[in-house]
Swiss-Prot record:
Keywords: Cytoplasm, Endonuclease, Hydrolase, Manganese, Metal-binding, Nuclease. This is Ribonuclease HII. Manganese or magnesium. Binds 1 divalent metal ion per monomer in the absence of substrate. May bind a second metal ion after substrate binding. It catalyses: Endonucleolytic cleavage to 5'-phosphomonoester.
Length: 238
């Protein structure tokens, strides 16, 4: 059963309104805390009860194809949504936890800036970003709360798309398969080529690679230089 984790640190207003009074429940989740490369993404979603979406679940248990299908449905049917991120530089400066909080804060603020203001924000996990709305953390919320499930899907798909773009620029690293996580393939590429500017220098395997080899910055001659797909956060029209 979903519950508020009252003992966890709360960074926002944690006085949740009565459930019956909530008209616009905003689900928030992040994607990409663990990888060695790429931004950390977050999404905020307010679902439309008049336009239900079947199949919403924690993005981690869905196939890539199913996530893509649901991504399009969420963007089309949700009352409002916003995707944001924190950069690799922000991750290295703030640490991954605080960068994740920043990405989630940006997602909620972006949604509210569109004119779709939440009555209550529910965040997956045991910590909340600082936002000017009632907010609560829901442990395993991505599996328990449909709006959080939707947010997890948007964040995951958006981040995976950016890592596939990064693969076009640095195919040696295999970003299209591991999307930045520390797989044996990725660690082997770090050992052979060193780290790129898109790697998180504050993460131990990247620090170790930089201690052995200079930064790998050259673009592959055969790859087209493509701008990242998520340089600007996006919000649904009302």
């Amino acid at each position: 059963m979903a519950r508020r984790n009252a003992a966890s640190p709360q960074m926002g207003l944690d006085l949740a309104p009565a459930a019956a009074a909530v008209q616009r429940l905003c689900g928030v989740d992040e994607a990409g805390r663990g990888p060695l490369a790429g931004p950390v993404y977050a999404a905020a979603v307010i679902l439309d009860p008049k336009r239900p979406i079947r199949g919403l679940a924690d993005s981690k248990i869905l196939t890539a194809a199913k996530r893509e299908q649901l991504y399009e449905k969420i963007c089309e049917r949700a009352l409002g949504w916003h995707i944001a991120f924190a950069t690799v530089e922000e991750i290295d400066t703030l640490n991954i936890l605080h960068a994740s909080m920043l990405a989630m804060q940006r997602a909620v603020q972006g949604l509210a800036a569109s004119g779709i203001v939440p009555d209550l924000v529910q965040v997956d996990g045991n910590r909340c970003p600082r936002v000017p709305f009632p907010v609560e953390a829901i442990v395993q919320g991505d599996a328990l709360v449909k709006a959080i499930s939707a947010a997890s899907i948007l964040a995951k798909v958006a981040r995976d798309r950016e890592l596939r773009v990064l693969h076009e620029r640095y195919p040696q690293y295999g970003f299209d398969s591991h999307v930045g996580y520390g797989t044996p393939q990725h660690l082997a590429a770090l050992a052979e080529f060193g780290a790129t500017p898109h790697h998180r220098r504050s993460f131990a395997p990247v620090r170790e690679a930089l201690a052995r080899l200079p930064m790998f910055t050259a673009m592959p001659a055969t790859a087209e230089v493509i701008e990242p797909v998520a340089t600007v956060s996006v919000t649904a029209a009302q």
